[in-house]
Amino acid sequence: MNGVAAALLVWILTSPSSSDHGSENGWPKHTACNSGGLEVVYQSCDPLQDFGLSIDQCSKQIQSNLNIRFGIILRQDIRKLFLDITLMAKGSSILNYSYPLCEEDQPKFSFCGRRKGEQIYYAGPVNNPGLDVPQGEYQLLLELYNENRATVACANATVTSS
């Protein structure tokens, strides 16, 4: 009888109709930061996996060395890792940016070279030019992908500056 109960529990927990990630709404929305006149809310756009992200020193005046925390379990190897950023406001593209995070001959981070199934947890600075975020609402699409263009992580974010 215990085997039947265990099988039923597994079926209920993995059934698309009972779990939020199988619905139209996708993964839950997370707040990466909310203070200093700036709010960043994101949702994973990868249908198979969610991840964690937080931003320290949340402010409309973004510092040149911004500290973040990021955690995920890899579904793909990352010999090479790339970040694409698309910034939009009022439906118009403002910025498209692509940056290599891991290259075989120049790994920039300790997680470069990690394998499928391993966990990445990064807590540290992210270098950026530093800027003042103008008042308004912005949409960000962030995509991390490996050398085979396989998605490592993907997020739709809303940035609100007041």
Swiss-Prot record:
Signal peptide from the UniProt entry: 1-19
GO cellular component, one term: extracellular region
Pfam name, any one: E1_DerP2_DerF2
UniProt keyword Secreted, yes or no: yes
Tissue: Highly expressed in spleen, liver, brain and thymus, and at lower levels in kidney.
Annotated glycosylation sites: N96, N156
UniProt keyword Chaperone present: no
Keywords from the named record: Disulfide bond, Glycoprotein, Immunity, Inflammatory response, Innate immunity, Secreted, Signal
Main subcellular location: secreted
InterPro entries documented for this protein: Ig_E-set (IPR014756), LY86 (IPR039945), ML_dom (IPR003172)
UniProt GO BP: inflammatory response; innate immune response; lipopolysaccharide-mediated signaling pathway; positive regulation of lipopolysaccharide-mediated signaling pathway
Compartments in which it is found: Secreted, Extracellular space
Disulfide pairings: C33-C58, C45-C154, C102-C112
Protein role: May cooperate with CD180 and TLR4 to mediate the innate immune response to bacterial lipopolysaccharide (LPS) and cytokine production. Important for efficient CD180 cell surface expression.
Quaternary structure and partners: M-shaped tetramer of two CD180-LY86 heterodimers.
Protein name as it appears in the record: Lymphocyte antigen 86
Gene name tied to this protein: Ly86
